[in-house]
């Protein structure tokens, strides 16, 4: 499964995975307004056998199939 990954210019460390590049039709308007103008970071092929760095590949794939997008917000803590 291919997907496009965008980062938010409004919210630091916030990413949006969608099924097709530039197709935000299944992303709720309220999410798009808080996300801001998306910036393409990566096009990738999702494979359950290959882990993603910050999210469960299976969870991302499931969300893409069911709702058309997956939002990821990361927080980094220095120890």
Regions found by a protein language model. Give the residues of each.
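Structured helix-beta-strand junction loops
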Residues: 12, 37-38, 67
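Extreme N-terminal starter segment of soluble prokaryotic enzymes
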Residues: 1-2
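Amphipathic alpha-helical interface surfaces
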Residues: 23, 31, 56-60
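N-terminal acidic leader/helix
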Residues: 5-25, 30
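Acidic, aromatic-enriched beta-alpha/helix-loop junctions
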Residues: 29-52
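Helix-rich interaction surfaces within compact, conserved domain-sized segments
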Residues: 46, 52-79
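Amphipathic alpha-helical transducer elements in NTP-driven molecular machines
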Residues: 21-24, 37, 54
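Generic structural hydrophobic/aromatic packing signal, biased to beta-strands
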Residues: 5, 16-18, 42-43, 64, ...
